[in-house]
């Protein structure tokens, strides 16, 4: 579990370290607010992703299933600044085993709510779906803006990082890969 008291103490010390007065009017409740925020945005650390997965048997469906533009936010583990974007998650069912559509979004949500790297998050989503339903293939593409590149360092607001993870047939078969990427990149 998250130790909110430790977080409050640490935030107070950070405020002091940057030359602020943690006892001034506008900052009095900041340590508590940050502790509650961290409990929420890092809730994926204490959630087993398997608990959000529900599998259905749908023998008739044997084509690509794609959930596009799933909003996501996570905290870059290098600077503890957010990265915000969307995930596109596609898979090709095997023997009719499918995930509920909302479960795809929940997988993204749980795995995002941890200190993360976008590259690892992309792979974790793909691997979770591979393990859960053993599809013929999985493709995950994440597009995100990293505030560590927007607010500091290179200071390039609006730049996006795109990562992909391909598993199964989407990695080994060029035609299948082209089809799934065309679906992901379509504007409709």
Swiss-Prot record:
The keyword Metal-binding applies. GO terms for biological process: one-carbon metabolic process; tetrahydrobiopterin biosynthetic process; tetrahydrofolate biosynthetic process. It catalyses: GTP + H2O = 7,8-dihydroneopterin 3'-triphosphate + formate + H(+). Belongs to the GTP cyclohydrolase I family. Pathway: Cofactor biosynthesis; 7,8-dihydroneopterin triphosphate biosynthesis; 7,8-dihydroneopterin triphosphate from GTP: step 1/1. PROSITE patterns: GTP_CYCLOHYDROL_1_1, GTP_CYCLOHYDROL_1_2. This is GTP cyclohydrolase 1. GO terms for cellular component: cytoplasm.
């Amino acid at each position: 579990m998250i130790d909110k008291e430790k977080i409050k103490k640490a935030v107070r010390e950070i405020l002091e370290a940057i030359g602020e007065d943690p006892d001034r009017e506008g900052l009095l409740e900041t340590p508590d607010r940050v502790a509650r925020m961290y409990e929420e945005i890092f809730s994926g650390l204490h959630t087993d992703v398997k608990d959000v997965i529900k599998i259905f048997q749908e023998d008739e469906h044997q084509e690509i299933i794609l959930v596009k533009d799933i909003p996501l936010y996570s905290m870059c583990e290098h600077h503890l600044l957010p990265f915000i974007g969307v995930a596109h998650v596609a898979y090709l069912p095997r023997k009719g085993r499918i995930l509920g559509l909302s479960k795809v979004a929940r997988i993204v949500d749980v795995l995002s709510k941890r200190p993360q790297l976008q590259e690892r998050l992309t792979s974790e989503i793909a691997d979770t779906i591979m393990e859960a339903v053993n599809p013929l293939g999985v493709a995950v593409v994440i597009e995100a803006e990293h505030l560590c590149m927007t607010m500091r360092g290179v200071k390039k607001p609006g730049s996006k990082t795109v990562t992909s993870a391909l598993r199964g047939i989407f990695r080994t078969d060029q035609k299948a890969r082209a089809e799934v990427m065309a679906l992901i990149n379509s504007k409709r």
